[in-house]
């Protein structure tokens, strides 16, 4: 054996030779290969090393992107990570028995926490760039979808995330043969060559490289079990001979290492449990950070009485609002003080005082008024509020009022006087309940859970209402009555209709009766316009919801709200818009189509019904709002359970417009001065007519437009089928109470208006038409057809007369035929075209011929005798133009006279219709 290999050996038989050759050891380690061998420096790595190194590199880049909040690049790196993990799956299933590496689970958990943190930071989200904001939503969806396959691994990781650091210590003790992954650190790959070089420099050659537990184990270097290819790969893997002959772990060693790790872990757990069992009573878990010692309430031998408790209460509440006050500790101290007071039986007044201070402390816990309070504090607030009001109602001699000064409080003799305002507390509680509802997703179970709390909120309001009916002033009673009304006005009560039908006794109290009692008290006693205005609006809304059309209409007309609503605050204007929308629905249900259209036209013509009803913000107008305005508008939004169905509202508006607009269009088809009743419906109809190919209707608007086209032809059956069908019933009509009655009313109106449209359209075709045939065609009673035609004749809409013996309608040829009307329109347009052409010609000629000297060209040889001729020709054209202007002015006066006559005739028609209705 050569001396070089002898230096690299570690056997005992050659130990003396190693000692002799010790001075030459450095030369052997510094031995270099030839130039050809130095050029090729390949490191042969296994597939596991390659895949894991790729994963760790991507994970490191993700962490760097998270530090600088680069969401866009984080999304890109996450996509690369999923692809790399997909490639590494075969290695994981083979090497790790299908168990996902812990460092990968850790990366997913950290990424999920990072996304949730950024998503909950709303102010920070607004400051993100457009690209990062868009990438955040995409990344959140992809991560939530991706981690569903790792839920069990993530849950185990979150239960014991510190296990990874223990693995790190164990792996540091036992060298990893693959160059290993440090699971506790940033999961960076260790290079075997670097580790071996450091070990060669730091450890003497005569000492073994392995740890103490492995020192007695020998490595089997059997040349017969290794192929030539493996030896060649080993030779190419290392740069010098010392690295080649350093000890490396085999598969057997890896298994032994795993066993030793498990044994160490079990021993640590046993020792920890044993220590906890032995010394658990004398030890406490130390919380990280500064620990605030809970102050003692009273001295051990102190005599607990009312002055001492009040002094302690004042001491606790004096820290209210200060910067370093622990608000949670303050609430806990107040509860402890209440318990001490109850234990020593200091009386109900002191308990009420502590209750009210607990309520104030809970309200103070949330510093930002715009954000909702925590659910634990909300449940606590409801409990304490109801407990305080029950104490007040059970003890009438206790007066809790804000008019009592603190120095005049009385706890020893009746009447007990305590400073506080339960009305302000219940108003704040009601506002917090609304904020909680707005914060929840309306389509989630959380919203339903929070909505169940409304029962407790209403009970609390009832308790406060009972207290102030005995002890409160008129102003305070009006305020608490309004809170009660605002929780009642939008709720539908079927008992009202049962009472109308006589199914229940008349003595039964319904929500309408409660609203009448509360609102009438506010009308009589309130001295502020806002409370009275809101009470009127809620009263009208409730009447309209229960089909009390005439009461609601009379109330709004007598109050003159529409005249001064523009001066009201935004929340009151929102309530006014909601009232008008519900009033329009009520008018539609009560067959008052024209009134329904008038109520809804102001809301729907703007195209911003969603914003006007405070049911959401339109994304199209986002650029028009600043961040502060958007925040304010979101605070004004109505809770989801109070929303009005916008599709129902739009459908009622379009159907009402169709029933009014289509007969009017048929009656004034050739009228150039025809006005539009509904601009929105007219635009929908015109846009549909401009389309070359129109498919079957799908949306609600398309159904209404298709029904309008059928009505223009007088086809009532097709019109009714488009309005009343399975799809429209599901979307719209089934949302009404007594929907069958509404559908029957719709079909009846469609028949009547289709009959009117048919007579307007085809009156110039008939000389006479039979009334029974019209009744059979439109499936209406003969008396109804006779009544409709009579009204049309009286209103001078139809030029005809009724022949009662023969039951026919005789048409009068007073109106021009279709061909004549088109010819008249053509003549008017040609006349206008001629006038326009003459004006254009005059503008092009200018004033050349009006100058007497023909442009003053006498010096160029023109005859001066021609000046008069040119001047006369220009004067003639001027006379013609003046005459034409006079004719136009005369024509304009004639048109004005005709318009005045038509207006007078229209007024006479309205008077006649009113007299007929009165009869």
From Swiss-Prot:
Keywords per UniProt: Cytoplasm, Initiation factor, Phosphoprotein, Protein biosynthesis
GO molecular function terms noted in the UniProt entry: RNA binding; translation initiation factor activity; translation initiation factor binding
Task: Show the ranges annotated as biased composition (Low complexity).
Answer: 895-919
* Bias (Acidic residues) ranges: 11-20, 162-171, 210-236
Q: Where is the PCI domain?
A: 640-816
Question: Which residue ranges does the record annotate as region Disordered?
Answer: 1-28, 154-275, 848-919
Q: Which residues carry this modification: Phosphoserine?
A: 34, 165, 177
**Biased amino acid composition, Basic and acidic residues:** 241-269
Q: Does the keyword Protein biosynthesis apply?
A: yes
Instruction: Give an example GO cellular component term for this record.
Output: eukaryotic translation initiation factor 3 complex
Main localization of the protein described in the UniProt heading: cytoplasm
Q: Which InterPro entries match?
A: EIF3C (IPR027516), EIF3C_N_dom (IPR008905), PCI_dom (IPR000717), WH_DNA-bd_sf (IPR036390)
Bias type Basic residues, positions: 883-894
GO terms in the biological process aspect are:
formation of cytoplasmic translation initiation complex
What HAMAP family does the record tag this protein with?
A: eIF3c
Q: How does it assemble?
A: Component of the eukaryotic translation initiation factor 3 (eIF-3) complex. The eIF-3 complex interacts with pix.
- Free-text function comment from the UniProt entry: Component of the eukaryotic translation initiation factor 3 (eIF-3) complex, which is involved in protein synthesis of a specialized repertoire of mRNAs and, together with other initiation factors, stimulates binding of mRNA and methionyl-tRNAi to the 40S ribosome. The eIF-3 complex specifically targets and initiates translation of a subset of mRNAs involved in cell proliferation.
Question: What family, per the record?
Answer: Belongs to the eIF-3 subunit C family.
What name does the UniProt record give this protein? Eukaryotic translation initiation factor 3 subunit C
Q: Which organism is it from?
A: Drosophila willistoni
Gene giving rise to this polypeptide: eIF3c
């Amino acid at each position: 054996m050569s001396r070089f290999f002898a230096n690299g050996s570690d056997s005992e038989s050659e130990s003396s030779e190693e000692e002799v050759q010790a001075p030459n050891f450095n030369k052997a380690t510094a031995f270099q290969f030839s130039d050809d061998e130095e050029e090729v420096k390949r490191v042969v790595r296994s597939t596991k090393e390659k895949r894991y190194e790729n994963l760790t590199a991507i994970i490191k880049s993700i962490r760097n992107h998270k530090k600088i909040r680069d969401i866009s690049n984080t999304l890109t790196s996450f996509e690369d990570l999923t692809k790399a993990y997909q490639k590494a799956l075969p290695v994981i299933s083979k090497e790790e028995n299908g168990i996902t590496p812990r460092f990968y689970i850790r990366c997913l958990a950290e990424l999920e926490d990072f996304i949730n943190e950024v998503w909950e930071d709303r102010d920070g989200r607004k400051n993100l760039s457009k690209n990062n904001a868009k990438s955040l939503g995409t990344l959140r969806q992809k991560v939530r979808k991706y981690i569903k396959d790792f839920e069990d691994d993530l849950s185990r990781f979150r239960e014991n995330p510190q296990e990874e650091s223990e693995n790190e210590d164990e792996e540091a003790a036992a060298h990893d043969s693959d160059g290993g992954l440090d699971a506790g650190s940033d999961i960076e790959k260790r290079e075997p060559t670097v580790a071996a070089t450091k070990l060669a420099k730091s450890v003497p050659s005569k000492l073994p490289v392995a740890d103490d537990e492995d020192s007695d184990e020998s490595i089997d270097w059997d040349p017969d079990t290794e192929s030539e290819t493996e030896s060649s790969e080993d030779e190419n893997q290392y740069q010098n001979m010392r690295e080649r002959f350093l000890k490396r772990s085999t598969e057997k060693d890896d298994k032994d290492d795993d066993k030793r790790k498990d044994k160490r872990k079990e021993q640590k757990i046993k020792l920890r449990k044993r220590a906890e069992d032995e010394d658990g009573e004398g030890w406490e878990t130390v919380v990280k950070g500064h620990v605030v010692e809970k102050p003692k309430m009273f001295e051990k031998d102190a005599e607990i009485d009312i002055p001492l408790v009040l002094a302690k209460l004042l001491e606790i509440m004096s820290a209210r609002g200060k910067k370093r006050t622990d608000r949670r500790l303050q609430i806990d101290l107040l509860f402890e003080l209440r318990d001490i007071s109850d234990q020593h039986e200091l009386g109900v007044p002191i308990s009420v005082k502590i209750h009210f201070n607990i309520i104030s402390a809970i309200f103070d816990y949330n510093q930002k008024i715009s954000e909702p309070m925590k659910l634990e504090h909300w449940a606590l607030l409801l409990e304490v509020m109801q407990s305080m009001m029950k104490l007040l109602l059970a003890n009438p001699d206790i007066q809790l009022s804000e008019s009592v000064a603190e120095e005049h409080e009385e706890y020893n003799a009746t009447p007990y006087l305590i400073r506080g305002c339960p009305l302000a507390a219940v108003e704040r509680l009601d506002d917090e309940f609304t904020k909680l509802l707005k914060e929840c997703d309306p389509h989630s179970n959380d919203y339903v859970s929070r909505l169940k709390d409304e029962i407790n909120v209403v009970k609390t309001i009832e308790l406060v209402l009972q207290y102030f009916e005995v002890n409160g002033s008129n102003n305070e009673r009006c305020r608490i009555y309004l809170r009660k009304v605002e929780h009642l006005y939008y709720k539908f009560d079927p008992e009202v209709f049962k009472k109308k039908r006589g199914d229940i006794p008349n003595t039964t109290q319904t929500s309408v009766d409660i609203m009448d009692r509360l609102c009438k008290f506010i009308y009589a006693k309130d001295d502020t316009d806002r409370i009275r205005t809101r009470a009127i609006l809620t009263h009208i809304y409730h009447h309209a919801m229960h089909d009390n059309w005439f009461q609601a209409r009379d109330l709004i007309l007598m109050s003159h709200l529409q005249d001064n609503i523009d001066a009201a605050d935004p929340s009151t204007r929102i309530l006014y818009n909601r009232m008008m929308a519900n009033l329009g629905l009520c008018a539609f249900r009560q067959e008052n189509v024209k009134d329904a259209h008038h109520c809804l036209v102001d809301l729907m013509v703007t195209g911003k019904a969603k914003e006007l009803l405070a049911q959401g913000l339109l994304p199209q107008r986002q650029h028009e709002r600043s961040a502060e305005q958007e925040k304010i508008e979101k605070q004004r939004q109505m809770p989801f359970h109070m929303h009005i169905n916008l599709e129902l509202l739009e459908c009622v508006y379009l159907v009402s417009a169709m029933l009014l607009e289509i007969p009017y269009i048929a009656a004034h088809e050739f009228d150039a001065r025809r006005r539009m009743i509904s601009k929105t419906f007219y635009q929908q109809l015109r846009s549909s007519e401009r389309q070359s190919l129109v498919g079957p209707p799908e949306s609600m608007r398309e159904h209404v437009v298709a029904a309008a086209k059928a009505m223009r032809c007088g086809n009532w059956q097709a019109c009714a089928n488009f309005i009343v069908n399975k799809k429209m019933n599901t979307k719209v009509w089934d949302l009404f109470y007594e929907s069958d009655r509404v559908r029957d009313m719709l079909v009846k109106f469609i028949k009547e208006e289709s009959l009117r449209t048919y007579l307007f359209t085809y009156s110039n075709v008939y000389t006479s038409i039979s009334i029974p045939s019209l009744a059979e065609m439109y499936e209406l009673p003969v008396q109804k057809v006779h009544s409709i035609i009579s009204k049309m004749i009286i209103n001078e809409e139809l030029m005809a007369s009724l022949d009662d013996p023969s039951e026919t309608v005789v048409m009068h040829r007073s109106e021009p035929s279709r061909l004549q009307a088109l010819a008249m329109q053509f003549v008017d347009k040609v006349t206008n075209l001629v006038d326009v052409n003459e004006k254009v010609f005059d503008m092009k000629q200018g004033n050349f011929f009006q100058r007497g000297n023909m442009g003053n060209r006498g010096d160029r040889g023109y005859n001066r005798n021609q000046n008069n001729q040119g001047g006369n020709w220009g004067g003639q054209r001027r006379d013609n133009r003046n005459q034409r202007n006079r004719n136009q002015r005369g024509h304009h006066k004639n048109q004005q006279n005709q318009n005045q006559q038509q207006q007078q005739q229209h007024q006479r028609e309205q008077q006649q219709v009113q007299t007929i209705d009165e009869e």
